[in-house]
Amino acid sequence: MLKEAHIEFSQKRRFYTNELKGKSKILVALHGYGQLAQFFSRKFAALDQAYGLIMPEGPHRFYLEGSSGRVGASWMTKEWREQDIEENTRYLLALIEKVKAENAAASIYLLGFSQGGATAARLYQSSPDLFETLILWASVFPPDVTVQDFDQAGTLHFAIGNQDPYFLEAQKEDVLQTYRNLGFKIHEFEGKHDIDPTTLSKILQ
């Protein structure tokens, strides 16, 4: 009879960054499902001079179509989900604590896009004092994170496009009300399921 077993070992995780030294603000941005950090980072190119940028990559990489071609990554699936959540949080905390130790005066802004939003919310929940601001973008708020977890939260923002195909109008209103109840400032922009540079700039002002 076979039974599930586990083993622990050290491993590397990949992230992308620009020059952090001398930057007073650092943006950590978590990509969505099926994206790679390298290409997701292009959406933030306009911030390269003013902000330190850190783009972690989800641990699960896969072919987007069939068994070859373009590759994407995700933060988790439904399989062994709780363990992935725990390991993602440990990985991201280790990364951010290292960055903070090397850039003690910098303020850290955390953004999660789409699937990365749930990972960002859990990370913020675990150590809210590390972050100046939490920005969740086109993401459903994770049900395992409660209102009480954000009682002492800093600045909270939620952004969504008015033509986002993943949020039908009725569902979108429910999502927006959830974020309002949590104390998030709502930003709706003209667009679909994507990062809008103008809206992002307004949030970061």
Regions inferred by a protein language model and the residue ranges of each:
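Gly/Ala-rich beta-loop-alpha elbow adjacent to hydrolase catalytic centers
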Residues: 111-116, 120
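Catalytic nucleophile serine of serine hydrolases
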Residues: 32, 114, 138
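Serine-hydrolase catalytic machinery in alpha/beta-hydrolase-like enzymes
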Residues: 5-20, 24-103
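Short beta-strand/loop motif that positions the catalytic acidic residue
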Residues: 157-164
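Active-site signature of alpha/beta-hydrolase-fold catalytic machinery across serine-
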Residues: 42, 122-126
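A conserved short beta-strand
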Residues: 129-141
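Hydrolases whose catalytic domains are alpha/beta-hydrolase-1, hotdog thioesterase
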Residues: 119-123, 145
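C-terminal catalytic histidine-bearing segment of alpha/beta-hydrolase fold enzymes
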Residues: 169-176, 180-205
